[in-house]
Amino acid sequence: HWLVLNDLASPTQKMDVEDLLDMLKWPETVAINEPPPGPVLAKDPDALRVIAKAMDSGKIYSGHAPKLPDKILQSYASTGASSDHESTESGEAWSKLTYGIKVMMRQGSASPDMEELVKLAIKHPAASRHMMLVADEIDPVDLTERGHIDATVKRAIELGLDPIVAYQMVTLNA
């Protein structure tokens, strides 16, 4: 089963494959986000069917590939994932970029990975066109004290990222 948050006020519900395929027909559906890597890599027919339908429908397929060994990451990339927000170190992010997966550099209360990954964008400016600055799981206290994506952009610039590139990463690249 896949978990879908269908409304901010609703609890998480289990959805079956047919539900997901129906939801992909909705004009409001713009993406399939973070399909579990286990079924995808195991070539589960249902998982691959949902991904294929999403891609055939012009929807974005955003991946979820934390710390996969290189050969497994190659297989995962071949399923068509356009992006991933699970990189925690530069080497992992570089591998994803090499295999055509855009890297989301997340900055949040639970996952402050951007500070490590921004070094990669500074070192390889051409790769920065395939990288995004994103917010992820920001604690309400952090949100009120530091801000949202604006704080992430500001911090990336403080770390040495060109300001134009930083704003590109939250607009054009996103």
Q: Where does each model-flagged region fall?
A:
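Glycine-enriched alpha-helix->loop->beta-strand junction motifs that scaffold or abut catalytic
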Residues: 28-29, 58, 75-83, 98-104, ...
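Conserved, mostly hydrophobic/aromatic
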Residues: 32, 96, 166
